[in-house]
């Protein structure tokens, strides 16, 4: 009986060791932007200009938590890295943060407000690719809808690209962030002067 008990114990130990040896590296979560040090911004006041950035629209294949790299017609996801949230949410946050940097006089938010905002920014990304060759590309169109219904919405579109390393997940995140920063800059330059 003790021999059988010993065999079961040994089998459990071997199974545990095999499972532990099969475990991969720990999962790393990434965001598109980092928060800088808190600035001593002046209070906005009761009638501050409010700019609401609506959730960005992306093709379904890309609106995931997976970090994707295109190899020809194949999308490969990272085994070790993920976005901390769905990509559309991360891009929305990035755009709002960049617009807030450009417009310190305004409250730039991704949250709906009680009163209608002075401007609502709606962004549709039709293409967002990072290739194994190290090229990131974004094609987008966007509207700036004034809160004043007597004014017409402004419509824009643009294509942006950047090149860089894609050897690691951090490289992919940095490259994707660079091309999305170009989009944010263009939105701020032409839409919200």
Question: Residue spans of the language-model regions?
Answer:
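Short secondary-structure boundary motifs at beta->alpha junctions and helix caps
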Residues: 74-84, 149-189
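Soluble periplasmic/extracytoplasmic beta-strand elements of cell-envelope proteins
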Residues: 50-56, 68, 120-124, 137-143, ...
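Surface-exposed short loop/turn segments
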Residues: 23-41, 102-149, 164-166
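A structural "domain/chain start" motif
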Residues: 22-84, 117, 192-193
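Sec-exported extracytoplasmic/periplasmic mature domains
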Residues: 96-104, 188-192
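Conserved Nudix-box catalytic region and its N-terminal flanking loop in Nudix hydrolases
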Residues: 85-89
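Sec-dependent bacterial lipoprotein signal peptides
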Residues: 1-22
């Amino acid at each position: 009986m003790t021999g059988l008990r010993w065999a079961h114990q040994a089998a459990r130990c071997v199974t545990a060791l095999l499972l532990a040896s099969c475990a991969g590296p720990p999962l790393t979560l990434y965001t598109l932007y980092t928060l800088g040090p808190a600035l001593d911004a002046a209070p906005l006041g009761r009638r501050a200009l409010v700019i609401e950035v609506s959730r960005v629209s992306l093709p379904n294949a890309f609106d995931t938590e997976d970090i994707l790299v295109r190899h020809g017609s194949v999308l490969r996801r990272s085994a070790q890295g993920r976005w901390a949230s769905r990509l559309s949410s991360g891009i929305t946050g990035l755009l709002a943060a960049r617009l807030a940097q450009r417009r310190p006089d305004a409250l730039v938010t991704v949250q709906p407000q009680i009163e209608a905002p002075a401007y609502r920014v709606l962004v549709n990304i039709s293409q967002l690719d990072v290739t194994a060759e190290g090229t990131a590309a974004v094609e987008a169109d966007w509207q700036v809808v004034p809160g004043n219904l007597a004014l017409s919405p402004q419509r824009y579109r643009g294509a942006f690209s950047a090149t860089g390393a894609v050897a690691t997940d951090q490289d992919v995140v940095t490259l994707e962030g660079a091309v999305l920063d170009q989009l944010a800059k263009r939105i701020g330059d032409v839409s919200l002067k």
